[in-house]
Design a protein with these regions (language model features):
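Extracytoplasmic
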Residues: 20-54, 240-246
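Residue-level signature of mid-helix packing/kink "hotspots" within the transmembrane helices
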Residues: 37, 65-73, 157-158, 268-276
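Extracytoplasmic gate region of multi-pass secondary transporters
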Residues: 39-40, 222-268, 272-275
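Conserved MFS/SLC helix-loop-helix module at the cytosolic interface between two early adjacent transmembrane helices
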Residues: 70-108
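Short hydrophobic/alpha-helical segments at membrane-entry points of transmembrane helices
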Residues: 109-115, 225-226
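Cytoplasmic helix-loop-helix junction between adjacent transmembrane helices
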Residues: 114-152
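Helix-loop-helix hairpin linking two adjacent transmembrane segments in secondary transporters
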Residues: 149-195
Length: 285
């Protein structure tokens, strides 16, 4: 069933909104965070097979964030222009292509290109979710709903720890990324087929007005009060969680691969608890 054949919005109960709006977008952000943090567990396998060094691993991990971050400004314009469903579904198809390329890579350069495509492909997962939730959920519930979608990303981070280490006993990292490519394609398909259209998702403004609105954000004192703290905290945490915590636990703390993955699991679990707790706290206060 396509979005055009979906039942009228008025017939969607809250449970159906959760099933047909929240869950498809949450699945996308789950994959986004799984891709983001998987290198902490995957790195020794890449080193063993392809001979990557620490600089290669650092670049391989960071290129996800470079392509992800570089696309945020055009992403906002695209979300306003075409709506979150179309934009995120299209981008997730790029993530699927990137995962296929990563799975077939035989050099650091090929891995970097694949991961750059993955970063670009999942760059809209969180912002598209926020955009969709604004028009589908009551304003009073948005902090809690946003907390839940952030928690779905945390579940992706959980999946990138001990579950990935377990999966690597069943297959190799190439097979794992082939599976992730299929999951990315299915997530894109779910967005296209399950999520209905709703008035308010697409802006009627032309590109010039959209750009003026974007520039107004950069002139806001509130933006400049909050941005530095967000940048510093996210940069440090994501570099540790997304890569360097794994090698440190294995090479410095002396843990084996399974124990290191278990340690990363509890880091991600604490993050999920924080997402859920802060969302509920914001709703109640």
């Amino acid at each position: 069933m396509t979005a055009a054949s979906c039942p009228p919005v008025s017939t969607l109960t809250p449970a159906r909104v959760v099933a047909r709006v929240f869950l498809p977008f949450a699945a996308g952000y789950f994959l986004s965070y799984l891709y983001r943090t998987i290198n902490a567990v995957l790195s020794p396998y890449l080193v063993a097979e392809l001979g990557l060094n620490a600089a290669d691993l650092g670049l391989l991990t960071s290129v996800y964030f470079i392509s992800f971050g570089a696309f945020q400004l055009p992403l906002g314009l695209l979300l306003d222009r075409f709506g979150p469903r179309r934009v995120e579904a299209s981008l997730l198809l790029l993530a699927a292509v990137g995962a296929v390329l990563f799975a077939r890579s035989h050099s650091a350069g090929e891995l970097i290109l694949g991961r750059a495509l993955i970063g670009l492909g999942v760059s809209g997962c969180l912002m598209a979710s926020f955009k969709a939730f604004v028009v589908w959920f009551p304003t009073a519930r948005l902090p809690a709903v946003n907390g839940w979608v952030l928690a779905s990303g945390g579940l992706g981070a959980l999946a990138a720890t001990a579950p990935v280490e377990w999966a690597l006993r069943m297959t190799d990292w190439r097979g794992l990324f082939s599976l992730l490519a299929v999951l990315s394609f299915l997530a894109a398909l779910a967005l296209l087929l399950a999520v209905p259209e709703r008035r308010g998702e697409v802006a009627a403004e032309d590109l010039r007005r959209q750009w003026q609105g974007l520039m107004a954000i950069f002139r806001s004192p509130l933006f400049w009060r909050t941005a530095p703290g967000s940048v510093l905290s996210q940069a440090s945490f994501l570099s540790i969680q997304g890569l360097w915590a794994g090698p440190w636990l294995r090479d410095v703390a002396g843990l084996d691969r399974v124990a290191a993955a278990d340690g990363l699991f509890w880091v991600a679990a604490a993050m999920v608890g924080g997402f859920l707790g802060m969302g509920q706290l914001a709703y109640r206060l």
